[in-house]
Amino acid sequence: MTAANPASTPNPESAPRSRELFDRALAVTPGGVNSPVRAFHSVGGTPRFMVRGEGTYLWDADDNRYVDLVSSWGPMINGHAHPDVVRAVRQAAAGGLSFGTPGVGEIDLAAEIIDRVGPVEQVRLVNSGTEATMSAVRLARGFTGRRKVVKFAGCYHGHVDALLASAGSGVATLGLPTTPGVTGAQAADTIVLPYNDLDAVRRTFAEYGDEIACVITEAAAGNMGAIAPAPGFNGGLREITSSAGALLVMDEVMTGFRVSAAGWFGIDGVAGDLYTFGKVMSGGLPAAAFGGRADVMERLAPSGPVYQAGTLAGNPVAVAAGLANLRAATPEVYAALDRNAERLGELLGSALSAEGVPHQVAFAGNLVSVFFSEDPVRDYAGAQAQQSWRFPPFFHALLERGIYPPPSAFEAWFVNAAMDDAAFDAIAEALPHAAKAAAAATEPGAGA
């Protein structure tokens, strides 16, 4: 079945195979999934087990077709199964899956990243965004000789113990303030501040400035929903950290090479000392990177004393996928991403306004979010204050009509360049039903 010949429109009873697979998964995997947000915990119902993707569409195990607004949580800017990426993966895999030695592709991918992001002078490849942020923080501590790290509430930097306090993404979806298993000692040197609050940063540096190794921030927040940095926020972080001798770590795992060819740096031009990347640069395979100033990066082993390693880092197949994905992302692709995000936002706003549903359609570049709120959302407290109980019926009304949005009120929506008029027609047809469902939702406990 091709994108031009869709499967039947999903409905609540149309996913028996997914239900069967989920029951099997529950017996062998905690919660039935390998990443919590996939479990539909906050929206209820049966997670869809996807078996195929093409362009802007996904097909589940019951052969239902969906317009995909998750894009594998970001990597698929060119759409699923892009011919250039598939060709590169096949060619690389035919030559061998892993060697445990240096490879030519590692050099090419690192050079591509360096060419795109001006402040990045050297790159180290790793296997996941979590490894990238963990390694960047370790390197910042090793370079500065300091211990404390400043992060922002609602920003998610992978499941690094010291950075899970007041985190976004799956932690926010599950409503956890942090997570069991992270000890007080592991988080003792982590300072959590409100996002977009430079005054709080200044006060913290006034008290602890000579103890702070780095500030780590999402270049634009996407893990509590899409929240752009306030004008001057990233620039203010740059000034404060530079004055105090601390490093600025820009987490661009989500925004990198998605919101522009140079990531968020291509939008605001604020230079970090270190960067973390993933998602788009992986092409959908397990790969990530961190990089930055050469004098900082050269502190890594074997050049320097800060240890970091990975058996599968620089895997030739993953590197080939990432390089092909980046090279397929032409200026026309980035123009399409921006255009598609704007079009999606207009459809969301129009449908919700027609039903009188309190909402904010928010953008961080071409990341999109819907907050069920009367007021603009600029930080984690604002995201948490939304009427998130409206989201589950909104989500399921879309899912039942062949639209696959993120299954959480605290995640960004990801467009791709393969979206066409047919995809937007399907979204436009489904959204009025979803808006009505959101309008009819009642707050748990209301009237009790």
Swiss-Prot record:
> Where does the record place the modification N6-(pyridoxal phosphate)lysine?
279
Q: What is its EC number?
A: 5.4.3.8
What is the official name of this protein in its record? Answer: Glutamate-1-semialdehyde 2,1-aminomutase
Its source organism is: Saccharopolyspora erythraea (strain ATCC 11635 / DSM 40517 / JCM 4748 / NBRC 13426 / NCIMB 8594 / NRRL 2338)
SUPFAM superfamilies attached to this UniProt entry: PLP-dependent transferases
Name the Pfam families on file.
Aminotran_3 (PF00202)
| This protein's encoding gene | hemL
State the GO CC annotations.
Answer: cytoplasm
Which Cys pairs does UniProt list as disulfide-bonded?
Answer: none
Domain of life from the UniProt record:
Bacteria
Q: Name one GO biological process term.
A: protoporphyrinogen IX biosynthetic process
- Gene Ontology molecular-function annotations: glutamate-1-semialdehyde 2,1-aminomutase activity; pyridoxal phosphate binding; transaminase activity
Pathway it acts in? Answer: Porphyrin-containing compound metabolism; protoporphyrin-IX biosynthesis; 5-aminolevulinate from L-glutamyl-tRNA(Glu): step 2/2
Compartments where found: Cytoplasm
**Reaction(s) catalyzed by this protein?**
(S)-4-amino-5-oxopentanoate = 5-aminolevulinate
Check the record and name the InterPro entries matching this protein: 4pyrrol_synth_GluAld_NH2Trfase, Aminotrans_3, Aminotrans_3_PPA_site, PyrdxlP-dep_Trfase, PyrdxlP-dep_Trfase_major, PyrdxlP-dep_Trfase_small
